[in-house]
């Protein structure tokens, strides 16, 4: 549990993108569309996440006593990544409604050779990360495409709110990750959580 009363996973991967929304819109220029890129893989996500209350952000995804297990850690990681997909889609809907020129994209960089990837896997299979996963430079290709590809700026409507599963490859995420009601719930629940600690203004 973090100092502000929520799990570190929820704070770092769910709440942080919500806090950046104001920074994002404050630097917009009609001549410089701004892209919000959310790096997201949801392979381990639970299908029970509704994000209706702040407690849903802190769900340990495990029975009491098993919170530190590799399976529970993988589920929490996947849930936070699914939240990024939901957040990116909800941000796009809101920016479109407000007439703000942002292209919000979520993506799955694939299995990348990092310590973080190894940490969410059971101990016995962690060597597979270093043997078979992509090098970080290769794993960054999807993120670089989302952030810099000219075709995204030229064909905005095609890419808005999209989910990339490789450079230039649009894919539908899981049914829950594309559920607009769950995305709406996540937005409001996260907003309430960050307002409660005084990070967002009350206006």
Curated annotation (Swiss-Prot):
Gene3D superfamilies linked: NAD(P)-binding Rossmann-like Domain
Catalytic residues, chain numbering: 77 (proton acceptor), 81 (lowers pka of active site tyr)
Annotated residues for binding of NADP(+): 23, 77, 81
Annotated GO MF terms: oxidoreductase activity
Highest taxon listed in the record's lineage: Eukaryota
Family the UniProt entry places it in: Belongs to the short-chain dehydrogenases/reductases (SDR) family.
Role according to the record: Short chain dehydrogenase/reductase; part of the gene cluster that mediates the biosynthesis of diterpenoid pyrones. The first step of the pathway is the synthesis of the alpha-pyrone moiety by the polyketide synthase dpmpA via condensation of one acetyl-CoA starter unit with 3 malonyl-CoA units and 2 methylations. The alpha-pyrone is then combined with geranylgeranyl pyrophosphate (GGPP) formed by the GGPP synthase dpmpD through the action of the prenyltransferase dpmpC to yield a linear alpha-pyrone diterpenoid.
Record protein name field: Short chain dehydrogenase/reductase dpmpH
């Amino acid at each position: 549990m973090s100092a502000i009363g929520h799990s570190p996973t929820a704070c770092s991967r769910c709440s942080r993108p919500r806090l950046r929304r104001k920074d994002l819109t404050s630097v917009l220029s009609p001549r410089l569309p701004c892209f919000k890129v959310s790096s997201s893989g949801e392979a381990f996500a639970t299908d029970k996440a509704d994000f209706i209350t702040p407690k849903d952000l802190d769900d340990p995804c495990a029975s009491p006593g098993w919170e530190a297990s590799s399976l529970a850690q993988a589920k929490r990681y996947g849930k936070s990544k699914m939240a990024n997909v939901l957040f990116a889609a909800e941000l796009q809907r809101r920016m479109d409604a407000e007439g703000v020129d942002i292209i919000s994209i979520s993506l799955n960089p694939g299995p990348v050779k990092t310590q973080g990837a190894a940490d969410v896997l059971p101990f016995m299979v962690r060597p597979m990360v270093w043997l078979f996963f992509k090098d970080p430079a290769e794993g960054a290709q999807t993120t670089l495409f989302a952030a810099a590809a000219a075709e995204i700026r030229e064909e905005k409507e095609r890419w808005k709110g999209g989910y990339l599963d490789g450079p230039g490859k649009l894919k539908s995420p899981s049914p829950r990750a594309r559920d607009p009601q769950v995305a709406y719930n996540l937005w409001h629940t996260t907003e309430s959580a960050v307002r409660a600690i005084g990070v967002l203004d009350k206006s």
